């Protein structure tokens, strides 16, 4: 377990009232939620092998993600209240349970803190060889959008995991359309891998910026012109050494300059 003791758990949940004599510690109440949250982290964000090799500072991000996710899951099942001093547990008649609205607000705050930590950790993990070869690393490496910041670019108040999951299929669809019809699958795959490996060059970064900008505009339902897509092709053509895969791709054939040859056998032959 990433979070092993009640003391460690309480480091991430401020201002929790002390348990009364005979009451189970908060850790015991949340243990099943902590296990689910850690499993979710290992599948979606950071596997256990990668976590074990992280620095203490980066492990703190993973721990915060687990606690905030577990707390979000647990709140409806716990006797928690939100007091002027922070979170509390209803352990005697001196504490009044929080309203439904305040509990909802508390859950929203846990998700906000979780997602901020997810975004920070994902950005840190790029270039980590263990993570790159892991299940979550390979999953993130399939898309040109490899963090949660796109949700903020599309109008959300902060990076949002739920927003990202709600739009990932649309993002992947746009990415595939751009790859097949304009930048080529080979170039798109290479850009995704460069992002994952944290080896993006300045020239690659400019093309990634163009692709990301088009995707953001499409998600925001802003008008995107074909000129934006043509600019990507022209940019690739201007940098053939960097994007050498493009010239031999099926996509490049779509942009070849064909010359019509007037043959005598043709019915429309003219001199």
Question: Where are the language model's segments positioned?
Answer:
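Conserved short "hinge" loops at termini or chain/domain junctions
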Residues: 1-63, 77-271
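Catalytic-loop motifs flanking and including active-site residues across diverse enzymes
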Residues: 66
């Amino acid at each position: 377990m990433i979070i092993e003791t009640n003391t460690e758990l309480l480091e991430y949940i401020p201002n929790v009232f002390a348990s009364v004599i005979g009451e189970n510690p908060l850790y015991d109440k949340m243990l099943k939620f902590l296990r689910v949250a850690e499993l979710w982290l290992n599948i979606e964000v950071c596997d256990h092998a990668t976590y074990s090799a992280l620095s203490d500072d980066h492990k703190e991000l993973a721990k915060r993600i687990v606690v905030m996710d577990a707390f979000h899951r647990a709140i409806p099942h716990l006797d928690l209240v939100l007091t002027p001093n922070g979170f509390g547990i209803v352990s005697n008649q001196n504490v009044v349970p929080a309203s439904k609205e305040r509990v909802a607000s508390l859950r929203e705050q846990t998700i906000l803190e979780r997602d901020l930590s997810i975004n920070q950790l994902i950005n840190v993990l790029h270039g980590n060889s263990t993570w790159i070869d892991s299940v979550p690393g390979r999953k993130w490496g399939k898309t040109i959008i490899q963090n949660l910041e796109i949700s903020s670019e599309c109008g959300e108040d902060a990076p949002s995991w739920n927003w990202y999951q709600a739009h990932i299929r649309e993002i992947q669809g746009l990415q595939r359309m751009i790859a097949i019809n304009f930048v080529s699958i080979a170039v798109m795959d290479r850009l995704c891998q460069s992002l994952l490996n944290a080896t993006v060059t300045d020239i690659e970064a400019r093309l990634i910026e163009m692709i990301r900008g088009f995707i953001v505009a499409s998600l925001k339902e802003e008008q995107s012109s074909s000129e934006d897509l043509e600019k990507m092709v022209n940019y690739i053509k201007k940098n053939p050494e960097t994007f050498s895969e493009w010239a031999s791709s099926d996509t490049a054939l779509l942009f070849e300059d064909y010359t019509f040859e007037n043959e005598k056998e043709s019915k429309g032959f003219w001199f």
